[in-house]
Amino acid sequence: MRVAKPELKNKKILITGGLGFIGSNLAHKCAELGAQVTIFDYLDPRSGGNIYNVEGIRDSIKIAFHDILNFDQISEFVTDKDIIFNCASSTSHALSMREPWIDLDINSKGVINLLEAIRRFNPQTRLVHIGTSTQLGKLRYQPSDENHPEFPRDIYSANKSVSEKYVLIYCRAYNLRGTVVRLSNVFGPRASIHSPEFTFNNFFIGLALQNKNITVFGQGTQMRNVTYIDDAVSALILASQTDKTESEVLFAVSDEHLSIAEIAKLTVEHIGSGRVTFVDWPLGRKNIDIGDAIISNKKIKKLLGWAPQFDIRTGLDLTKNYYQPCLEKYFP
């Protein structure tokens, strides 16, 4: 299937959480395609936002330093937008278990605020909401798909599951034009590479860039999809361009299935520094590990003609080239 070039020129686009990893890369691409981009971001350090992420486009976009938990503020910014990408999220699995109320506020109440604002003030806008593969929990069949039941194992994943349902309920009850795109282990430029609180493979990249040990529990045999950021961004944009995806849930993941040990070793190889060490599982950690997590992308390929363009090796090379000149910007 031929994929048409997205039509974003002069479109008014709002990106909540636009200073974070996925949101900022989305902002760069939308600006490149001629859109009028507004970023709405509180810059909460727990969510991985970084003002340096918009270096190079800051003069061509608008940034509103506001909180999605403030209904009046988010309402003001949804009113005239053609497309809204909801990337605002507290993204740490571990933090969600330590501070569940914070995760509940951002990942559930924040989404309700956004949906209510859209319903009241701009019901014709196009909404793309980001979900996550961890909503599924331990997989009952593989490759899993959008019909797999959800058994989340942490508060973050549970709230992402609930917020996805909020989006679908509002779409069906109020005819909002929303789509959920679930992502899995996205890596690349502009990520939070300094902390294990965020995606494990981006943390691996940060360790390798500092020539440190990458620690893998057990033998690291658990299989994962890893998706380069440009592929994730292209999926999000394509999902906003057609009514075929309205009220749908789509997995946008890579075709590659690699073990955690393989991901660690390839990271060291392509970054050119660091080393991989294997240690016994910490007490209690193995009990919450979900094992293999292989996801199918057949639905999004069929509906949108989307397909990943970057393998992990190419993605790691591009990631290294991005971080090396500006590494200090990503380590607080």
Model-predicted segments: where are they?
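CheY-like receiver
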Residues: 76-77, 117, 207, 235, ...
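N-terminal Rossmann-like NAD(P)+-binding domain of SDR-like oxidoreductases, especially those catalyzing
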Residues: 1-183
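C-terminal substrate-binding subdomain of Rossmann-fold SDR/epimerase-dehydratase oxidoreductases
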Residues: 1, 26, 32, 212, ...
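Short, surface-exposed alpha-helical segments at coil->helix boundaries
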Residues: 48-51, 164, 202, 261, ...
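NAD(P)-dependent short-chain dehydrogenase/reductase
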Residues: 141, 168-224, 229-234, 238, ...
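Short-chain dehydrogenase/reductase
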Residues: 104, 153-161, 195-202, 226, ...
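Active-site proximal helix/loop that lines the substrate pocket
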Residues: 89-95, 132-135, 185-191, 221, ...
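Short, solvent-exposed loop/turn segments at secondary-structure boundaries
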Residues: 98-99, 140-141, 155, 191-196, ...
